[in-house]
Amino acid sequence: MQRIAESYLSTGSRIDINYEGFKVPLYSTEAIVLIGVVIAAIVFQLLAFFASATTPVTGALYSVTQGYFISFLVFKVLGAYDLEYLGAMALMITVLIVLTMSLLYAKGIIRVTKKFKMVITTLFITVIAASLFSFIGYFIPFTRPMIVAMQHNFALSVISGVIFIIIAALFLICDFDTIDHVVNNKLPKKYEWQAAFGLAFTVLWIYLKVLDLIITIAGHGRD
């Protein structure tokens, strides 16, 4: 979302956005809806994670918001250049990642231990901290040039994208372990919903990161 906001030209009621080298016209109403969807996604995500009683509803609503955002990227951004097939490519890669991690977990090749959870949690906190630094830094005049330079560095964008995908893939192992724990211990329904949402959240996260990486590569040199 920040990348969409960082480079635009307002022309009446229309905004020409630049997303990873893809220039796409966006009407102000669409921009407002998109921003609203992103904000709603954050709210629903937090409620689903921390207010377990609301997970059946907020989890579903979160998935809807992500579906809207994915549709925007595939049909609005890529569709403007007849590259919708890249969305299908991202889906196939995501399915391959999920199947691979499922196999690694089922075969016991990767086991969920306290050390594994600690490493994953540390990586997740690092990712969140880096994202917050990037977002906040963009609005600070002193750090904005550095943030913009980092975001427009192709090699850095690709490397960070791959790292994020690896971290998200490892989170799948934790999700599988959580589901096993809930089922084997016959925990209450609310835990089943939370486990299901956790898995859905991770899969959507992987897809968006894979799609963003593909868009970054496809859009390289279009600026």
Predicted regions located by residue number:
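A hydrophobic alpha-helical transmembrane-helix feature that marks the membrane cores
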Residues: 1-223
